[in-house]
Amino acid sequence: MKRVLLLLLTLSLLALRADEPVSKLNGAFRQVKNKFGTMTDWKPRDSVTVIKVFRDGYWLGAYYNDKRKGRRWFDGACGGTYALKNGKYEETVGYYSWDSTAVGKAYSFDYAISPKQYEQYGKMTSDKYKDYPINEVCDRITAAEPLKNNALEGVWFMQEGYWGGTSRFGEGNYKDFQVVKIFSYPMVVYAYYNPKTRQFDGAGGAMYQFDGKTLTETNEFWSWQPDGSRKGNVESFKMTLENGRFVQEGWSGKLREVYAKAN
């Protein structure tokens, strides 16, 4: 009888480990060391800022503040969805600025998560990156103050967008585009991409605070000004939330975006 109980307990623990809630990874992380490609030793990540943000099954990564010779200040971004299954971190690529052939592919990684760090070990493959090792250790990004109102926390997709002039979400250059916005305190990140053509348009990220009415963003990166001149800018937006949607307004009336919550 004891053996049966022990077996049942073991199976229960394995089942729990096999399919864990995606919220286990929620948070924002900054890479502190890596071992990519043909590297034989771990290298501190001190010449470029690399972040990875998780929230409720969605992820976004970005490289910016790049001090490496011959590189732009904003180097690129990627993202998609993820799941935790069979003890692995499984991610599917929805956009990838360095190589569009990675879009749609799924990769499985060993991982470890703690209150202070996220670790990831495995390989990816695409036309540009063949059987490419990706091993990284990231520190959790902590907030300077508590979040005042958590109503924005989660993943959102743009339904309407207007930025002044003739630009409209879903029309012209933005026809068939998706825009995802991820709030995972203390960061908010977002990306513009076309899932049909695998085109990546751009991404942005900021440290944020929300009091229930006003969203305040302190810019970290904004790919549409890839020289980094926008970093540190503080912007405030009027926010209206209702029935699983929010309206964001700013830029002296030039910006109006409507988002609906994912899932």
Language-model segments: residues:
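Lipid interaction determinants
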Residues: 18-77, 90-203, 211, 216-263
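A surface-exposed loop-and-adjacent beta-strand signature within N-terminal beta-sandwich domains
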Residues: 84, 88-90
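A generic structural signal for ordered secondary structure
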Residues: 6, 79-81
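Bacterial Sec-dependent N-terminal signal peptides
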Residues: 1-24
